[in-house]
Amino acid sequence: MPANAKVTIRYGKYEACGTVEYREDRLDGLQAVLKADGHEVELKQIEDWNVVELIVNGETVYTCNITELDFGGDGKLDPLCAEALQAVQTAY
């Protein structure tokens, strides 16, 4: 995969503090890791709850539960961010 691939992060809303909303705080680390590797990142909201999907070249290359991602941060210590980056790097 070229270093400057376009990665679409599709994410759903999740419950926190008794409310269900779209929140991007748990995506900060994932975005940071992908951008540091030279990828262009686009965020898209979807109707599904508790889900994150990474799309490269129209293919879903990685999916996880959004609540399992670390809140905030740079993503370097989050094992799910490392898995997602590996999936993007091996996509074709």
From Swiss-Prot:
Cross-referenced InterPro entries:
UPF0728
Report what the protein is called. UPF0728 protein
- Source species, please? Branchiostoma floridae (Florida lancelet)
User: Pfam family example for this protein?
Assistant: UPF0728
Q: Which domain of life is it from?
A: Eukaryota
Family stated for the protein in its record:
Belongs to the UPF0728 family.
